[in-house]
Amino acid sequence: MHTDDRRTVSGCFLFADHGLTEAAEAILDRCPIRSYRKGELIYSRDCFERAVGVLLSGEAEVLKGRGVVLNTLSAGDSFGVAGLFTENDRYVSDIRAVRPCRVLLLSAPALEQLFAADNAAALGYIRFLSGRICFLNQKLDAFTSSSAEGRIVVWL
């Protein structure tokens, strides 16, 4: 990996608290980097890799349903985290390159090696997923609130 790529990866949720260790760098150096053109699907509901993707450069959109943009990803952002260790054969959304992108792909075996070599990265993964669970619980609260005012307050 290039120096700029290492800097970008060191800011992702796995390493943000402690930076890249030598062991982590050695594991990441064995992970593939894929390039995508503007408009190209990186992941789709039916065609995806069982890997966490870390955007090294470019910009991508997370799309749901009929092209509704849920999120915009930039360098250092990730996708595929929640679905990596599941048995589900479908990905939850589409990821499309808005600009040309380069993506580092960390497979489940690579992450397992990383977690064994770098406990802080494992904690970063757990923290990230815990944050997503809390976020989704807040959204559930919004949908199940007994009043319209309560739903709006929780939604905001």
Residue ranges, per PLM feature:
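Polybasic "coupling" helices that flank or enter modular domains
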Residues: 116-156
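Short phosphate-coordinating micro-motif centered on Lys-Gly-acidic
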Residues: 41-47
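Cyclic-nucleotide recognition modules
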Residues: 71-127, 134
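Cyclic nucleotide-binding regulatory module and flanking cytosolic helices
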Residues: 1-38, 83-86, 117
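Local beta-strand/beta-hairpin segments that build beta-sheet-rich folds
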Residues: 42, 69-71
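Glycine- and acidic-residue-biased ligand/ion/polar-headgroup-sensing regions
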Residues: 39, 50-61, 65, 75-77
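Short, small/polar residue-rich loop motifs at catalytic or cofactor-binding pockets
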Residues: 28-29, 47-49
